[in-house]
């Protein structure tokens, strides 16, 4: 069954009444406003649950000072599902320099005044304050996923327990949770056991037979070598084909992480995205102002999930996985047609992509059968020969999307891996030609992040020769096509191992080789469950044990950024 009505999930008592419900089965709570879009996790999960037959409602950004929001729909029959939003609430609320962010792209009106710090903990406490002895509280989303085991927390500069313990919740769904959350809802409805559901974290009083024990909270809090040992085991048990269940002692009880759910197949991904999304802000929240994020995602199409880039500072590997999965052409084209039929659509599809724009349609055959390699990366230090890069499926898809009546422009806004383009000897240049001629809005995003080899090695990023070769070919094709187009370079300051001298060299490179003054320079933020955050806390390369320089002062971190961004006198 494909969901067609209602287009929005209910968020008010009036909507519940119109639907004829006595109460919802499930109430989802989120730190973002309710934008009904396949790009917004809480919306997608809500639609999947509703399509599975569960009466699902959403409460977005509830007020924390009373029950006026949290109690307006009553108590759900099965469970409360809580997400901090599309990004970790502390990342959303604070800059890398510890300053409070004034604006928020997911809050109506744009002011950052509706999402509490540590939103999962705050919302769980809010539920328990007004609903005593309530139904289970289930955590999900990126904040839950990355904080599911003991982790380094940059904002308190400390090792924290699993968010499942700190929020005093009942269950935690990690990763892309469509399968796990439906299985959990069915089990709770039927009174069946839940503790074997894949993709679920639970709490146990006992050790779990057959699962792997990782160093305890007390051990990793007092011993940085134990933290490194813990993270290696955690990171190595994220692939559904090879992962074992894990458990970790936290105080007198144990966190239990079941093995991950199998990745969605193409058919399953299609089914999720073939559900109808309003691609708009719910009218109840629209009265409080516009949501800026909608400008980016309203007319964009997600084509694939996962990333095998494995950049040290990126959390996608732990949340979405290292195996890329993609939707069928048919499903993507049907979504484009639905977008064209929207009254607000003016002819421009702002993006068709995924975490990395040009990973659609090909994967390592060995990985698909046996799982990710435990001892090597797909792209670093060089591209693995087992990965047969082939841009032809993406070229074909883009051509078909351009051919849809009503589509005037189709842009690639997702960042691309230029090393993949250069390594695809058969179709890489054809793809680049397609990009230059049809899919660049004036600037094409690429993320070299740095140019200095010691820093790139710790990041897991390709070297500068491939960057210069790509720039040369992009500029030549743009000139040939008569288009005034540029590359936008995303760069990073203060990554573990990066010194001011490295940033001076980066500045010199951008001036002399790239002929630009960078405008997109971010300061590294140690987010939970990444290798770069492990480096930041331990001050060592986790793969070699080598001691590395870490810039930890806010002043020094800002200085690194300013070295690159300052204009020449």
Model-derived regions: residue spans:
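Nucleic acid-processing catalytic cores of prokaryotic defense/repair systems
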Residues: 24-30, 37-74
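Terminal amphipathic helices with adjacent charged low-complexity linkers/tails
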Residues: 65, 194-227, 231-238, 261-264, ...
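Glycine-rich beta-alpha loop elements in corrinoid/cobalamin-binding modules
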Residues: 41, 60-250, 257-258, 262, ...
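Conserved, mostly hydrophobic/aromatic
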Residues: 170, 272, 307, 332, ...
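Flexible glycine/acidic-rich beta-alpha junction loops that bind and position SAM and/or redox cofactors
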Residues: 88-97, 146-148, 178-183, 323, ...
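Conserved SAM/AdoMet-binding glycine-rich loop
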Residues: 28-30, 44, 59, 63-64, ...
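N-terminal [4Fe-4S]-dependent radical SAM core
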Residues: 2-23, 33, 228-300
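N-terminal pre-triad scaffold of radical SAM enzymes
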Residues: 29-35, 286-315, 333, 340, ...
